[in-house]
Amino acid sequence: MSYASDVKKELTNLAVHRENAKAELMALIRMNGAISIANHHFILNIQTENPAIARRIYRLLKQFYDVDSELIVRRKMKLNKNNLYIVRLKTGTDMVLADLGILKDYQIVEVAPTEVLTDDAAVRSYLRGAFLAGGSVNNPETSRYHLEIYSLYEEHNHMISEMMNQYGLNSRTTDRRGGFITYIKEAEKIADFLSLVGATNAMLKFEDIRIMRDMRNSVNRLVNCENANMDKVANASSKQIENILLIDATVGLQQLPPKLQEVAVARLEHREVSLKELGTLVPGGPISKSGINHRLRKINQFAEQLQKDA
């Protein structure tokens, strides 16, 4: 089961609170519902590939409305295709849709009523329904951080984004596959959204994974930095040794001033050590790192002058 499926499973197991659960049902029907007409009556089909979501829609309808509804399973013949679960409402469809603010004067209303947008519990409930209907979230262990909710209507998509941003989630919108998405890419904001809609266990798992990823990234950056420093030291040491050998082969190390000669000999004898360690190995030492570095620069300048004079 994917991480997104785990999130939705947790959400479908949440207790239904009568005072705000209509907002969740409102989002589920607005985003996954399809209206048809048969025998001069409206029929509502609410479709999903997730059986737990279908059962939750069915329970919500039964809890709020005394209507004739049924749960239908359509098996797909193609390989690797999920079954399609349909909650069908045959009677009272226009009454239910009007009560939920989805149908007005026989026209579809693309956004939620104002009272939903201004009530904290209702906003959380609506966002939960919207995520169940059209949401997805990447596995934080293997992918880039990304959570999105797909909506068919642009105005509705912007409304979802506005709802999210009431809580500082920094969501953005864009068009996608004949519709629109609201998305979040910041890890902390994704965790905040999961907590907001009630997926507490999924949020805690997400945070654990995020913290471990951040720690691994910090360690990797530190290792890369240390490796870069080691390469820098190795390259500098190689150049120093090359110049010292040039001086020795050309005029002899005895031509160097005594203090430079001591450092040159010590470097040849201890080619792998750092400047700080080299300072403790010079006969006239210990010499500070900056002191050793100064003398090695003088040796390099001496070698460069020999090359110019050659």
UniProtKB/Swiss-Prot annotation:
Claim: Cell division is one of the keywords in the record: yes
Taxonomy, superkingdom: Bacteria
Keywords attached to this entry: Cell cycle, Cell division, DNA-binding
DNA-binding region residue numbers: 274-308
Biological process (GO), any one: cell division
Any GO MF annotation of the entry: DNA binding
Cross-referenced InterPro entries: Homing_endonucl, Sporu_reg_WhiA_N_dom, Sporulation_regulator_WhiA, Sporulation_regulator_WhiA_C, WhiA_LAGLIDADG_dom
Keyword Chaperone among UniProt keywords: no
UniProt cross-references to HAMAP family, sorted A to Z: HTH_type_WhiA
Similarity remark: Belongs to the WhiA family.
PANTHER family the UniProt entry points to: CELL DIVISION PROTEIN WHIA-RELATED
Function: Involved in cell division and chromosome segregation.
Protein name: Probable cell division protein WhiA
Origin species: Lactiplantibacillus plantarum (strain ATCC BAA-793 / NCIMB 8826 / WCFS1)
Lineage, highest ranks first: Bacteria, Bacillati, Bacillota, Bacilli, Lactobacillales
